[in-house]
Amino acid sequence: MLEAYRKHVEERAAQGVVPQPLNAEQTAGLVELLKNPPAGEEEFLLDLITNRVPPGVDEAAYVKAGFLSAIVKGEATSPLIDKQRAAELLGTMQGGYNIATLVELLDDAELANTAAEQLKHTLLMFDAFHDVAERAKKGNAAAKSVLQSWADGEWFKAKPEVPEKLTLTVFKVPGETNTDDLSPAPDAWSRPDIPLHALAMLKMARDGIEPVQPGSVGPLKQIEAVKAKGFPVAYVGDVVGTGSSRKSATNSVLWFFGDDIPFVPNKRAGGFCFGTKIAPIFYNTMEDAGALPIEFDCTNLAMGDVIDVYPYEGKVVRHDSGEVVTTFELKTPVLLDEVRAGGRIPLIVGRGLTEKARAELGLGASDLFRKPEAPADSGKGFTLAQKMVGRACGLPEGQGVRPGTYCEPKMTTVGSQDTTGPMTRDELKDLACLGFSADLVMQSFCHTAAYPKPIDVKTHHTLPDFIMTRGGVSLRPGDGIIHSWLNRMLLPDTVGTGGDSHTRFPIGISFPAGSGLVAFAAATGVMPLDMPESVLVRFKGKLQPGITLRDLVHAIPYYAIQQGLLTVEKKGKKNIFSGRILEIEGLNDLTVEQAFELSDASAERSAAGCTIKLPEQAIAEYLKSNITLLRWMIGEGYGDPRTLERRAQAMEAWLAKPELLEADKDAEYAAVIEIDLADVKEPVLCAPNDPDDARLLSSVQGRKIDEVFIGSCMTNIGHFRAAGKLLDKVKGGIPTRLWLAPPTKMDAHQLTEEGYYGIYGKAGARMEMPGCSLCMGNQARVQTGSTVVSTSTRNFPNRLGDATDVFLASAELAAVSSILGKLPTVEEYMAYAKDIDSMAADVYRYLSFDQIAEFREAAANAKIPVVQA
């Protein structure tokens, strides 16, 4: 075991990274060596068992906890670890497999006090809390001391407070850094391996950044240079963390600039992140990891500056001169407690443990922790989002949660996908989660199914069982995109989250998050939320000929720019949507599938979430279809069948008594943007390479196009029919490389049945497996330096391909561009659009599974499990 491990250490050192944590097999080998240690290896073996085994309910932690438990019970021995030391080591494992033994040791005369000391600083107790409380009631002195310690918050008091002054060195990245810069999509396979993945951070050369190996290894020399000044380093930018929700972006920043977590291998916490604007999901992920994220004007900071930050006073000064650079206000005073506790999640869990212990002991509420400042009640009405969150928090019907209020809404639906799923699995293990508390947790395999690496194949084989044994639902590789499936599992007016920034429910509301917070939501069934303000977008009038929903998606940033509420320039960036909820009304004849195109794109606005006012009939039709789909899934052997049936029954219950929340007429919004559909007379695109840079077709027409992509969660079956109708009229091939990727296998099947795949083949299109395809850029990519029209979600630099120029546009405009080999004039486009408009009723039909015999019969014949009410 040691020989193989040392070889691994050498291989990793050659890559410039630390060794991976021990797996279960290696830990089992280590256990045998600890029982009979080779001479001279004693210290090394002790270090491995102490510091290189993951905590929680990891498989290796199971082996470690089993061995240490056997020692304290006298069932095993090691000359290096006595009973006392074994109990202490159990106390370093955070929670999960170590807890039962530590609680039992409270009855052991020899080790009770040692076990008590460990439990006093263990937060992940869950149901084992009651085992300690029962012992305390029966007079167990050690258990009493544990309960009292929890009640007094000793776990929190033992940690140092945030200092009055922080002296830091600036690592400045000018302009906008999105999460793809920090955690590049082509390197997604390595995300769970934090040290290895971190090497790719900022690997593309840009202003002020010099990668060691452009395209593969980031600016390690610059990082070492700022560290050499001897102070902790702050990551600083103009706009930081836009784009995907990936926690791997935070992990990479903290790997270089954070602090080691005692007894936890290959993971760091703490650190500092400052930005003129910090995207909301990235901000929350930093919070969860124990970092100190602060928004202030960073214009006058440069790479290598040494600054003094005064977190309580709210000012930044130059270390040498004392010159005030800028001032700031913390988003919430609770942030300082979060940093002290090691993160927002440890604070929430620990605070809950303290409250529980105080209630058990008959004590009043603790005044140890900072409380969020409750906003003044304006007495005005509530928005739709505020009412949805209010219901999820158990408030009286019709009551909402005011912006600025801290709350913990119930998570009804949680989604996870395959490039974040392995990290979510690790986080769930760290949280000692063996069963989900959220009502429905779904895992997809849409980002890696098409062109899997060996590590992806391993994930495809192992992650489904991990999810299903905890009561979750697992899709299969090739099924299609997470959102296209998860949307069909939603309940109206409920709240959820997902480990993908495009988890934007078209019914209800979701607050997408990084994998740590997603794991917390899945495990506990709630999620911490500082309720954001809302921005209302109100459409009026009638949709003009040739104008698509995607044009309305892009009209939102276009109109915001015209009104001075959004700027494309990164310095002094203005974005009215950032961190707020986008609420949309006025499009009263949308289907739910169409509504998702609008809610989905709220991610590109950096909005915290989105709601859309939809008619009751549209939602009822959608749920009827989805009940059939869920029972078809049960018949097809998808699991967990009880979770699927429970959700189907909840949909039936809503249909039996349909009702929808509505915004009050006097609800308050941070801004109201009115868009008259009569004024949107030509297609609106987003120009390279910024989803905020919305432009009219007439301003960019004529640009030569090399490649076209029609796919992503922004598309549905109607878009592929529209493209097919246009392509069918082409004689011979097309002058562009055309990629087509339907969102689900059901769409692909239906399009095949209707003959569209034959049309695509005749046109020379490259057909991709249902799923994300080019959109994330982690597998197949467009040609370097090409100009592309894409229906995908984002057009950040280097996302679809290296050095590409990408226009975001509707499927209809994308299809026309593929035929012409250029962006058409408005007149050219309208000539094609006229044909589509004349066939709209046939083209824009959506999948109603309750009306498709194959699905209806399979659902009727499925073996439905009994579900407890």
UniProtKB/Swiss-Prot annotation:
Pathway: Carbohydrate metabolism; tricarboxylic acid cycle; isocitrate from oxaloacetate: step 2/2; Organic acid metabolism; propanoate degradation. It catalyses: citrate = D-threo-isocitrate; (2S,3R)-3-hydroxybutane-1,2,3-tricarboxylate = 2-methyl-cis-aconitate + H2O. GO terms for molecular function: 2-methylisocitrate dehydratase activity; 4 iron, 4 sulfur cluster binding; aconitate hydratase activity; metal ion binding; mRNA 3'-UTR binding; mRNA binding. It is an enzyme of class 4 (lyase). Coiled coil: none annotated. Its EC number is 4.2.1.3, 4.2.1.99. One of its GO terms (biological process) is tricarboxylic acid cycle. It comes from the Bacteria. Its cofactor is [4Fe-4S] cluster. PROSITE patterns: ACONITASE_1. [4Fe-4S] cluster binds at C713, C772, C775. SUPFAM superfamilies: Aconitase B, N-terminal domain, Aconitase iron-sulfur domain, LeuD/IlvD-like. One of its GO terms (cellular component) is cytosol. Substrate binds at R191, S244, S245, R246, Q417, D418, T419, S501, R794, R799. Belongs to the aconitase/IPM isomerase family. Monomer. PANTHER family: ACONITATE HYDRATASE B. Involved in the catabolism of short chain fatty acids (SCFA) via the tricarboxylic acid (TCA)(acetyl degradation route) and probably via the 2-methylcitrate cycle I (propionate degradation route). Catalyzes the reversible isomerization of citrate to isocitrate via cis-aconitate. Catalyzes the hydration of 2-methyl-cis-aconitate to yield (2R,3S)-2-methylisocitrate. The apo form of AcnB functions as a RNA-binding regulatory protein. This is Aconitate hydratase B. It comes from Pseudomonas aeruginosa (strain ATCC 15692 / DSM 22644 / CIP 104116 / JCM 14847 / LMG 12228 / 1C / PRS 101 / PAO1).
